[in-house]
Amino acid sequence: MPSNTVFQINILILIKSNKPKHMKILKLFMVIYFSGLNAQQEQEIDSLKADTLDLLNQEKKNFKFFGVTQFTFNQAYFENWVSGGENSVTGLLTIDYNINYLNKLKWVWDNNIMLSLGTTYLSGNSFFKKADDRLEINSVLSKKVNTYWNYSAYFNFKTQILPGYRFYTEDGEDRKEEVSQIFSPAIIQLGLGWYYKENDLAWFNISPLAARGIFVNKNYTQNLSTGEKYFGVERGASSIVSVGASFSGFMRSKLMENISIDNKFNFYFNYLYKIKNIDFEWNANIRLKVNEKISASLIVHLQYDDDLIKRLQIRELFGLGLVIDI
């Protein structure tokens, strides 16, 4: 009989003849084995947790978050004032936040969110009216080629928050008609190209291949007259899409120790039609810091877009208010 068979028989005999003792040894061995296994698993879990925390901490370091929130309140009151005047109340909220990301693989992701929302009331009027209403999101994802230049893909989104109205008087009463709302219009622009960035104070994006879409609620276009358009969208339609090129940028500079100016601009060239027309937008924000919490700001916003209106649009806001820096 082979030796391995004899060995198996002997083992069986020993187990049968000393069953209680060997069962205790077997149980003890199993307890020691599984205790060691659990300890090893706990060490692996602790190591995994530590690696995950290190990764999360590193990702947090890759993000840079900064911005400003400003509240502005204006009020005027007149009584028996010979030269005249109207009582008024105006409130304005301005938010401008940046979220930037850079990792070791040289991927760059820059994001900017801007919100400006204000309302005003004049004595004698039946309705509050908008002083400002604007939401804009910019995002650029890029891969570094060298110190300053990157391959890029960008996204731009613009809309309003509150409904827009046309005010008129009929039969001696003030009336209003809704002419726009949130996401109507909504303007989306996408593009591929090159991104030049020296630092957070200056960048430029060139996109020879860009697409732009204007989206509206069909309720505003279904009753249009023949040839009439709503933000460039024809009767019964809900969008208009074009292909072109874009050039956009941002620059921040100090005029004095407590005065800074932000310049943002965007040019869009349409390849499909109206090639000679260039849509452009320029936004200048001058900030005067009085102290840590009080500041004044002057916003000058120019825009020309043939699809929206065939005239130069001008928006100007000045305010003194409370600032929260983040």
Whereabouts are the PLM-identified features?
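Repeated loop/turn-to-beta-strand initiation elements of outer-membrane beta-barrel proteins
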Residues: 107-109, 148-151, 201-204, 258-261, ...
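Transmembrane beta-strands of outer-membrane beta-barrel pores
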Residues: 71-77, 115-121, 157-163, 198, ...
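Outer-membrane pore/translocation modules
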Residues: 129-242
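Residue-level signature of outer-membrane beta-barrel architecture
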Residues: 97-101, 139, 143, 155, ...
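Membrane-embedded beta-strand positions of outer-membrane beta-barrel proteins
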Residues: 67-69, 111, 153-155, 192, ...
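Sec-dependent signal peptide cleavage junction
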Residues: 37-68
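Extracellular loop and loop/strand-boundary signature of outer-membrane beta-barrel proteins
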Residues: 79-85, 121-127, 173-180, 229-237, ...
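Outer-membrane beta-barrel "beta-signal"
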Residues: 314-326
